[in-house]
Amino acid sequence: MLEKDWGIYWDNSNNIPIILNKDLESIRIKSESLLEIAQDLRPVFLEEKHLLKKLFQLEDDIYFKSVWCTKQGRYIIDGVPLKKSIVRTINELQNFDEFRVEVLSFTKTDEMIQQEESIFNKFVEENKNHLNLLLNSKERDREGQYIGAYPFIEEVIEKYSKRVPMVSFSGGKDSTVVSHLVRKALNNQSILHIFGDTTLELPLTYKYVERFKEENQMTPFFDERNEENNFFEMCKEIGPPSRVKSWCCSIFKTGPMGTTLSNFEENFLTFYGVRRKESASRSKYSKVSKTPKIHGGIVASPVIDWYDLDIWLYILSEKIDFNESYRQGFPRVGCWMCPNNSDISQFLAKIYVSRNEYNEINFDYKEWEDFLYSFSYKVVNEYHLKNNIILTEKELEKKVKEYVKKNKWKARQGGDGLEKSKDTILQKKECINEKNTYILNLNREVDEEFITLFKPFGEILIQTKGKIQELFVLNRKKEALFKIVFKDKSKEIKITLIDLSDRYLYGKIIRQLNKFNTCIYCQACNSTCSFGALSVINGRYMIDESKCVNCLNCVNKFDMGCLVASALRVKSKE
């Protein structure tokens, strides 16, 4: 059963989309003159219909029509594409505050709710055979895995029986379905769930997670978050994340989850809600694979080849609870200010993400927008100063507004306009008197943490000669790899390379020095070690030698050795 075998058609008699096998159902497709309407669809709920009504000045009967949305953000109403662009319309919208009030004032009637249920019940009934294949098919895919979710889950559990099964739960529709599938397939409600709370989720995501825990009290549920860092304050220090330098996930999601899971001695079999159709990068994922992101490292993806429409077919068929952000029109649920979000998601966040007595979010869209303007002012101003371009205050203000409006902050890289970027400058020079020796000046005094950073290379041996200390790093054969000479409370160090067989050794050492210079204890490094040897807790960077296997993944994982240093690096002007 391959993706190309299936198509999404419009069933005029029932006024809903149906998923059909192009070969097996060819007679029906021809006899009923069914038209393939989209590569994928999602249902449009009443709340989003209300938004469309206000945005496009539609008639009141929109609430009672069968409305669906394509992956490209095009709406299909009763089988007919709406010939209006939502992106263009929101960009041309006048008086946003008034529009927002109209959207938030919506109240559903019983008649509207009954009609919505009727549409979805027809959708479920007409697609039940397709859902049965998704759940129970024992055909094998090109990887040799069962196509049906239930036999796939059962087989994977049997194959990795010594591992602890776990569901990675994000609060989105895909992980909601995977959670339900796994617990149902195994007839076991006590499957461990872990939620990586980035502290940046949509308000309704938090409400849904609380409902999930309340309704599934037999399911052990871990909420993991970075308690030591504040996203908003980090943005002020190192700039907002961008599509080029998306530092936030490692710091606020995989880092905290890695910290918790590394404390377990068991290895995990993690069930993910990842799907190949979500992005070009995910299209290359395997259904079962190893991952360094989670301690123990095997992940299984039961819905990896499902459409969006398949996910919704399961949710509506099983009548399971889901994140109500989807009702508002969010095509995907995640961090509400993510630089990878679409214009539509950004627009919806501007409507729905605001502080009030009903949520506990750390900051809202208005505060985020104000920050973006102040940050962008520094970036734009510094760019013009560097290039000797003189602007009046009015001209500068205009360029800043354009920078924010066109989302240029999403494409930024480097620490232009940020004081912290100076910490990425490592002053170094080659020693004339000694071969393979370099003198470097740090921006911090050498301390115990400095020594800790070299434990991944091998055994540490320190010799003291008065105020001077010599740090030798030895390999497993007790042979010296390199030597670092420094004085107590000094910022100057001298590095001598002893083992010249590794031509990348000096670069690896520099990576650790970058880490020492710029470390803000963000906890991103916690996710780099699959053996639980590394931990950043309470403002301390620690490595447990008894667990470290000297794989150097913690050294090589991030560009420049440090996620923060990488985010702050400013390209030198040629």
Give residue spans per PLM region.
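Acidic, Ser/Thr/Pro/Gly-enriched interdomain connector segments
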Residues: 512-518
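Short linker/helix segments within small regulatory modules
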Residues: 327-330, 535-547, 551
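Nucleotide-activated chemistry modules centered on ATP-dependent adenylation/adenylyltransferase
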Residues: 1-168, 173-447, 452-505, 512, ...
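Iron-sulfur cluster-binding cysteine motifs and their immediate structural context
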Residues: 524-540, 553-570
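Cysteine-cluster motifs in flexible loop/terminal segments that predominantly coordinate metals
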Residues: 331-347, 519-525, 551-554, 558
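Generic detector of short, aliphatic-rich beta-strand segments that form the cores of beta-sheets
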Residues: 338, 506-509, 558-565
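Hydrophobic pocket-lining residues within nucleotide cofactor-binding pockets
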Residues: 198, 519, 548
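Short, well-ordered coil/turn residues that connect adjacent beta-strands
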Residues: 517, 531-532, 545-546
